[in-house]
Amino acid sequence: MLAATRRWFDDNILELGREMRLSYLPPLMVYVAAGVSGLTGIVGTFFVKEYLGLSAAFLAALGFWAGIPWALKMPLGHLVDLAWRHKAGLVWLGAALIAASLLIMLGLVAEPQRMGGIMSLEAWFVLSAILSPVGYVLQDVVADAMTVEAVPRVNDRGETLPPEARRLMNTTLQTLGRVAIIGGGVLVSLVNVLMFRGVESLPNAARIAIYAQVYGMALVVPAISVAGVLLASLIKRRDAARLRARGFDETSLRAMLESPADTIQPDWWILGGSLVFVAISVSVGVSQLEFGQEIIFLGSLSVITFLMARLLRELDENSRRTLLGTAIVIFVFRAMPGPGAGSTWWMIDVLGFDQSFLARLSLIASVLTLFGLFGFRRFMGERSIAYIVGFLTLTGTLLSLPTLGMYHGLHEWTAAHTGGIVDARFIALIDTALESPLGQIAMVPMLAWIANSAPANLK
C-alpha cells in the first residue's frame, strides 16, 4: 500500500515537477494572476448585497453583459495571431483595465461619497463589472498564445524536437496552467480565511476597512501578469544568445524561436462575423426587446456556427471531426444553467453562511480542485473529451442534489436526527469536498489538443 502510494505520488506530482521548464513560467504567471483574481469574490458579494442594494436579477443581467467579452475569445485570439510580436501590449492593456476596475471598487468601498458625487454608485459598479472581464479575456487569450510559444521546437543544441516530445510538453504545460490558476485560488482562499476571521461580529466601519484592504491587495493581480510578459522577453533573449553562441545565424534563430503565426493574413470572415455578433448583442440588449436574450442567443449561435465552418476548412479531416465533436460536447456542457448570485444570497440569508464560513468553503474547494487535477491526471490523458464531459455531467447532477435538498429542508431533517451535527454547514462542506476535485478536469485535454493540433496560424 505504501509503495503504491509512493509510486502514485511520483507519477502524478513529482513527475509534473520534473517536467517543468523555465520557458513555461511566463504564461503560468498570467494564469496565476487569473487565479488570484478571485481574491475579491467574497468581498464583492457582501459589499453589493449590504451597501449597493442591487438585486440578484440585476446582477444576473449584468453577468450577461460581462460575459460578452468571453464570447469574443475567437476574434480576440485571431487578433493576437495577427499582432503576434506585439501581443505583450495586450497583456499591458488588460492589466490596465483590471487595475482600473479594482481601483473603482476600492473607491466605492473607501470613499463612496466622493465617488457618488461624480456619478451614481450603481453606475460605477457597472463600469467596474464591464472593465474587469475585458481585461481578463485579453490576458487569457495572450496566455493561451504564450503556451504555444513556451513549448520549444528545438533543444539546447538547436535540434528539432520530435512531435511526441512536444505533445507531452503541451499536455504538461496545460496541466500546469490549471495548477497555476487553482494554486492562485488556494492562495487567495487562505488570505480570505485570515482576513474574514471573526468579521461577522465587527462593527460596520471595521468591516468596510477590511473590504478596502482586500481590494487594495488585489492590485497585485495586474502586476503578476505584467511580470510574466517581462520574464518571457528575458527568456527569449537568453535562448537567442545561447543558440547564437553555437553559431546559428539570425535567420535560423527566427525559424527556431519565433512562431510561424507572424506571417498570417487577417481572416475578415472571423473579424467581420465577430462585429456582427457584437452588433446583434448590443442592439438587442439595449433595445430591451421581448425575448431579447433568445434573439441574441440564436443570432450569436448562427454567427459562431458560420465562423466554425470557416475554421474547419483550415483543418485536415481527422482534426475537423475532433474539433466539431469537441465543440458540440463543450457547448452542451457549458450551456447548462447555473443558479447565479441567487444561490449565494440564499445561503447567506436562509442558511446563515457568513464571510468567514464562505472563505473556508472557498479554501476547501480550491485545495481539493488542485488535488483533483493531480489525482485525475491519468484519467484526463487516457479518456476522450466526450467521455470526460459525460462523466462530469452525471457526477455534477448527483452532487447538486444536496443543495436542492437543503432548499426543501433536508438540513433541518438531518440536524434533528443527528443531534445538530449534520446541519446546513456540514452538508455544504461535504458537498464542496466531493464536487471540487472535478472542477478543472474538462479544460486540460481540450486546451492540450488545441495547443498541439491546431494550425500554427490559428492557435
Locate predicted features.
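Intracellular loop-helix junctions on the cytosolic face of multi-pass helical membrane proteins
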Residues: M1-L22, M115-G116, S120-V126, A150-P339
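C-terminal ends and interior cores of transmembrane alpha-helices
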Residues: A95-I118, T395-I421
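Substrate-agnostic recognition of the 12-TM MFS/MFS-like secondary transporter fold
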Residues: Y31, F64-W70, L127-M195, M336-P339, ...
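Short amphipathic helix-loop junctions that connect adjacent transmembrane helices
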Residues: I42-F58, S283-Q293, D316, P339-L358
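Juxtamembrane helix-start elements in MFS-like secondary transporters
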Residues: S55-A66, F125, N170, D354-S362, ...
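Conserved extracellular-gate-facing transmembrane-helix segments in secondary transporters
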Residues: V32-G41, D140, V284-Q288, V329-A341, ...
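Helix-to-loop junctions at the C-terminal end of transmembrane segments
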Residues: W70-H86, F371-G390
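Residue-level signature of the transmembrane alpha-helical cores
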Residues: V91-S101, S128, M217-V221, S225, ...
